[in-house]
A protein has these predicted regions:
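Non-catalytic cap/lid and distal C-terminal segments of serine-dependent acyl enzymes
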Residues: 1-185
Length: 185
């Protein structure tokens, strides 16, 4: 599925408030328009898994972490989960809601989503090779937050030979999808 990343995350010269509003519109579009159609066409009793690589991992993580009741799991590959990397420290309410590292850090320990997260299968994966530094750094931060909040998320750091590339994302998906589908019926 396409995104509006060129109008939000990657639009470096855009007005920050417009960019963050565009991202929030995209999130709402996924939840309010795409998800109902997906579920209407879903002939199984399983909730969907949300997944994506690179900026798609960021979008997948935002979607899952903000609405865990709608999905059975998450596979996020090589994402950057802190809005500072794209907005250079600027933040408003819309951007806050779309920056997993920010909103999870401030989530109360008794928030009902934590129980929901722990009923799901959550996988974050990043390589440690070319173009993976920022993703690895933000995943280390997320792992710390998950550990502090007692959220059972699998944060997997692959080797220094694993680069930010489709070749590796296909390998990772072939590895993780069967794990997420276990016990799905």
């Amino acid at each position: 599925m396409d995104s509006v990343d060129e109008e939000s995350w990657s639009c470096e010269n855009g007005i920050p408030s417009w960019r963050s509003a565009r991202q929030e519109q995209y999130h709402n579009y996924i939840i309010e328009e795409v998800y109902p159609i997906l579920m209407q066409k879903n002939t199984s009793n399983m909730l969907p898994i949300v997944t994506g690589p690179s900026l798609g991992a960021n979008q997948a993580a935002i979607t899952f972490l903000r609405r865990p009741e709608l999905f059975s799991g998450l596979i996020a590959l090589s994402g950057v989960y802190n809005s500072d990397y794209f907005f250079h420290g600027w933040c408003d309410e819309n951007l806050y809601k779309n920056s997993p590292e920010r909103f999870l850090e401030n989530m109360p320990a008794d928030h009902p989503y934590i129980r929901l997260y722990n009923q799901k299968k959550i996988v974050f994966c990043v390589g440690q090779g070319a173009w993976e530094y920022d993703g690895a750094q933000t995943l280390r931060n997320l792992k710390r937050i998950f550990d502090e909040k007692k959220i059972n998320a699998w944060c997997d750091f692959w080797g220094s030979d694993v680069s930010h590339d489709w070749y590796w994302w296909f390998i990772q998906l072939r590895y993780f999808i069967p794990i997420l589908l276990e016990d799905q019926g």
